[in-house]
Each structure stands twice: as C-alpha cells, then as structure tokens.
Amino acid sequence: MDLPSHSINAMKSMEVIDINTGTKLGLIKDLKIDTEEYKVISIILPGSKVGGWFSKGNDIEIDWTDIQKIGVDVILVNGDNLFVNKD
C-alpha cells in the first residue's frame, strides 16, 4: 500500500488554513525536524510584518499534531494552539 506523500517544495506552495476560523494563515516558510526521531515537529509560517518593508515579523509555529488534513493544494490546521515565535 502506498502512503500519500508530499515533497517539501510542494508543501511550501500550499495555503495553510485554520479550520476553526477559516483564516488563511499563509504559506510554509520552514519545517522544524527532530533529527533523532526522523520526524517533523512543526511547520513555521512567516508572521505579519507591521511597520514597513524592512521590519521583521514574528513567525507562527504550528505543531505537527495540529495539522488536521493535507490536501492537494491546502493544509488544514487546528489554530487553537498557535505559537508566535519572537526571535
């Protein structure tokens, strides 16, 4: 049996949507990977940039367990536990 799979490049072009509000959260910027367990821990989305072109936005980190469905062109997530990374 073949399991559904997606490349990182394909996933980076999928819109991420919060299933609770219907809000478009954006596109995947990066993945956080556990290199000892060989699994994805979370996806990282660019945060909104308030204050101009050169301002740094706060990234949004979504735990992999909060991903509800990966479709053909969209990723549905439970946005109840969004974490804003203020690096």
From Swiss-Prot:
It comes from the Bacteria. Pfam families: PRC. Gene3D superfamilies: PRC-barrel domain. NCBIfam families: spore_YlmC_YmxH. Belongs to the YlmC/YmxH family. PANTHER family: SPORULATION PROTEIN YLMC-RELATED (PTHR40061:SF1). This is Uncharacterized protein CA_C1697. It comes from Clostridium acetobutylicum (strain ATCC 824 / DSM 792 / JCM 1419 / IAM 19013 / LMG 5710 / NBRC 13948 / NRRL B-527 / VKM B-1787 / 2291 / W).
